[in-house]
């Protein structure tokens, strides 16, 4: 079953000088697949993520998430779609500093008007799995960058989204915390069969994925699959990036 389909999608923006953020791009990802998106700066990676999220409308083509066409949704419908079907993890964490860790995590469930029992059950289970049970009552200003990203991940998946979108989630982390956070993504993917669509410029981060889609100038440039050879996978990533001029 496909979780995400793009058919000949183009995104053109700008008034006086028009830019093609995506140029007739087609791709498909399966449910439960962990896909990384790589490419040079300005290649269209963030544009792709915003188009999939329904934030940036496609100029032409068709986008489906979990069997639902998202092109043509009204602003209100797109917002509801994002709340129900998508989870987001960003480089900057985007946590609410006036709330504690637990309150940040349950925010999506509050918007869905879930019961307190459901909130308690889910946050307890997630916190245990992510190793953040001991910090649930702390303010986000009192925890480390790696812990903040774990909290952001918990918030992104607590409402059980169809697809998790991540934009440079290790960009503000050191190598140790980056590896720990990517291990969390991999565990969620494997244990919950969570579909993940992750943008990164970092080869190490990309090695945690099942497949990497490379885009350049808004077009599909190449794609590679992980297989069983992790070292070979990383070398293939480096080879493609070198061909792209990265």
Task: List the model feature ranges, each with a label.
Residues 139-143, 147-149:
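Conserved ABC ATPase signature
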Residues 61-69:
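Conserved ABC transporter NBD signature motif
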């Amino acid at each position: 079953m496909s979780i995400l389909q793009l058919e000949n999608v183009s995104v053109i923006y700008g008034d006086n000088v028009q830019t093609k953020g995506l140029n007739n791009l087609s791709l498909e990802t399966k449910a439960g697949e962990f896909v990384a998106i790589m490419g040079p700066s300005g290649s269209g990676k963030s544009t792709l993520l915003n188009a999939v999220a329904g934030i940036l409308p496609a100029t032409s083509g068709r986008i489906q998430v979990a069997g639902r066409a998202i092109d043509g949704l009204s602003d209100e419908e797109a917002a509801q779609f994002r709340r129900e079907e998508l989870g987001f993890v960003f480089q900057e964490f985007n946590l609410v500093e006036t709330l504690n860790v637990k309150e940040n995590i349950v925010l999506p469930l509050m918007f869905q008007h879930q019961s307190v029992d459901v909130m308690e059950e889910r946050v307890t289970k997630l916190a245990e799995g992510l190793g953040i049970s001991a910090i649930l009552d702390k303010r986000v200003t009192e925890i480390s960058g790696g812990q903040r990203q774990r909290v952001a991940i918990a918030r992104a998946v607590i409402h059980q989204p169809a697809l998790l979108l991540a934009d440079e989630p290790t960009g503000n982390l050191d190598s140790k915390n980056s590896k720990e956070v990517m291990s969390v993504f991999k565990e969620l993917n494997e244990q919950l069969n969570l579909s993940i669509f992750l943008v990164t410029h970092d080869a190490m981060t990309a090695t945690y994925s099942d497949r990497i889609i490379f885009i350049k100038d808004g077009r599909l440039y190449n794609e590679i699959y992980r297989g069983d050879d992790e070292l070979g996978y990383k070398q293939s990533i480096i080879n493609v990036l070198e061909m792209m001029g990265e």
